[in-house]
Amino acid sequence: MTEQTVLALITCQTYPEPSDNLKTLAACLESMGVKTVFDAWQNHPSVPFLLPLCAWDYAAEPEAFRQWLEHAGQAGQCFINPPELMAWNMEKTYLCDLAERGAQVIPSVFVPLQKTELADILNQQGWTEAVIKPAFGQSGKGVVKVCAEALDVNMADYP
């Protein structure tokens, strides 16, 4: 990268201020001649290189985030990870995709919104307990552990 190269370390509007570790990364990059800026993905930064490390609120607006990835790529901006990979990784169904390809992942079942009979799913899988997660999310938000004997989860709460 040349001295004119600018890399945006992407944050989000919910948490726009960079964390200490992000500031440390920026200082390291700057010491190597890479100019860095911090900007929220919702601001559509127009720099040539994008590294979305702290786009923590994407789960609240997954379609808007997916569109941002697509538009930035179409505009010729470069991501460290391919936008298609990031879009695929946003939704927890990627775990099922990995399992189908032979990767060892925690046993996972994707439950469409219409299917709300959690007891049936647990029974079919032979599970006495399970962890329920939203399809889009991170940091444990909306994650709950359930037991077959006491199912009090409203599956409609998990988009």
Question: What kind of region is each of these model predictions?
Answer:
Residues 1-80, 85, 93, 117:
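ATP-binding N-terminal substructure of ATP-dependent carboxylate-amine bond-forming enzymes
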